Amino acid sequence: MTENNDIKMVIITGMSGAGKTVALQSFEDLGYFCVDNLPPMLLPKFIELMADSKGKMNKVALGIDLRGREFFEHLWGALDDLSERTWIIPHILFLDAKDSTLVTRYKETRRSHPLAPTGLPLKGIEAERDLLTDMKARANIVLDTSDLKPKELREKIVHLFSTETEQAFRVNVMSFGFKYGIPIDADLVFDVRFLPNPYYIPHMKPLTGLDEEVSSYVLKFNETHKFLEKLTDLITFMLPHYKREGKSQLVIAIGCTGGQHRSVTLTEYLGKHLKPEYSVHVSHRDVEKRKGH
């Protein structure tokens, strides 16, 4: 392994109810390969798989909790082994919270503590805290989540573990055809079927909004300009608020009948408009289908 192939590994552990699920989701948003509840005895084998991935798994987050408590002796050995591998950059993130906070969270979710499935949550919390003493001592980072909302925990993790590029709010702008269905991952959907349709001009029928003749045709109409003015104003207003609420990306879908002409033209326009301020990815889901409107 060379420096360029170094693997960044984060082991997420801590008190049950302290936010490990939110933490794993946050790392997933940052592009980490995430595994929850990996038995420590499998960690050496997992490391071998990472080494063989040829850079495809260069950021990994592993969630370990008390469902694997009988394997803690294996964990200590695996952690010692990690320290000897110079091409792995290991971090242990320990999530903690006050006993009273954890009790409240268990009551709110009506779940049993894993160490007190039939008893009081506090008994399980006390036993777990004792069991995790050594793990907490070995942690690189300890986060107290007692006063953190899920969004605030995510923001802390993003701040601690992401690069400047990874912190960028990503905007995906895509065109689609309603005849093929609305994209299931779309956050915002705009219907532009009210605009004049180049499909009915014979020589434009086989073209798409990526062709200058089609885009010029769509953009020449007054209603197109008015719509784009209102659309860009709306999106420009909304994006900072979505970012503030903790979203890592926003998918904006613009649809026409077949996803060939109007939606493609406007998607290209919106993408270019947003790129100076945001990390933007433009895609055209149905542009290759060319099945007609």
From Swiss-Prot:
InterPro entries: P-loop_NTPase, RapZ-like, RapZ-like_N, RapZ_C. One of its GO terms (molecular function) is ATP binding. Pfam families: PapZ_C (PF22740), RapZ-like_N (PF03668). Keywords: ATP-binding, GTP-binding, Nucleotide-binding. GTP binds at D65, L66, R67, G68. ATP binds at G14, M15, S16, G17, A18, G19, K20, T21. It comes from the Bacteria. HAMAP family: RapZ_like. Displays ATPase and GTPase activities. Belongs to the RapZ-like family. This is Nucleotide-binding protein BCG9842_B5683. It comes from Bacillus cereus (strain G9842).
